[in-house]
């Protein structure tokens, strides 16, 4: 039985001037997704996708590299201004934000959307190092 030819979808050049940057910074990784106003993903990157492994993924430098990569992809689509939504407790929050600003985006607003429980689930046990 012959395999069907796999079609490669060409990425269309959209002309989007403003969007939303979702920065999800966990203890282990930092993921950045840039979407349009409706929430459709335009560009994404993460520290792991940029080649960092293990504990190096959680560093501010890895977050900066991932944000620069994501910004470059979004600027190819004509994006100029961003709203930034930061989520999570990780160390890459501020450095990713600075990298987006340094890439030439006009940042209109910064929102922290980290979920905070109103005494919900029991938290993890404290680490003893």
UniProtKB/Swiss-Prot annotation:
InterPro entries: Ribosomal_uS11, Ribosomal_uS11_bac-type, Ribosomal_uS11_CS, Ribosomal_uS11_sf. GO terms for molecular function: rRNA binding; structural constituent of ribosome. It comes from the Bacteria. Signal peptide: none annotated. GO terms for biological process: translation. SUPFAM superfamilies: Translational machinery components. One of its GO terms (cellular component) is ribosome. Pfam families: Ribosomal_S11. The keyword Secreted does not apply. The keyword Nucleus does not apply. Keywords: Ribonucleoprotein, Ribosomal protein, RNA-binding, rRNA-binding. Disulfide bonds: none annotated. Gene3D superfamilies: Ribosomal protein S11. Located on the platform of the 30S subunit, it bridges several disparate RNA helices of the 16S rRNA. Forms part of the Shine-Dalgarno cleft in the 70S ribosome. PANTHER family: 40S RIBOSOMAL PROTEIN S14/30S RIBOSOMAL PROTEIN S11 (PTHR11759). Part of the 30S ribosomal subunit. Interacts with proteins S7 and S18. Binds to IF-3. Belongs to the universal ribosomal protein uS11 family. This is Small ribosomal subunit protein uS11. The gene is rpsK.
């Amino acid at each position: 039985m012959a395999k069907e030819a796999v079609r490669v979808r060409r990425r269309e050049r959209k002309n989007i001037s403003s969007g939303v940057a979702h920065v999800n910074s966990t203890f282990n990784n930092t993921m950045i997704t840039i979407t349009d106003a409706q929430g459709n993903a335009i560009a994404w990157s993460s520290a792991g996708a940029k080649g960092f492994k293990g504990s190096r993924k959680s560093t501010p430098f890895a977050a900066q590299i991932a944000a620069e990569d994501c910004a470059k992809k979004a600027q190819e689509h004509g994006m100029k201004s961003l709203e930034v939504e930061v989520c999570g407790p990780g160390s890459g929050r501020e450095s990713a934000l600075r990298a987006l600003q340094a890439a030439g985006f006009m940042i209109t607003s910064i929102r922290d959307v980290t979920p905070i429980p109103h005494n919900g689930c029991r938290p993890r046990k404290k680490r003893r190092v």
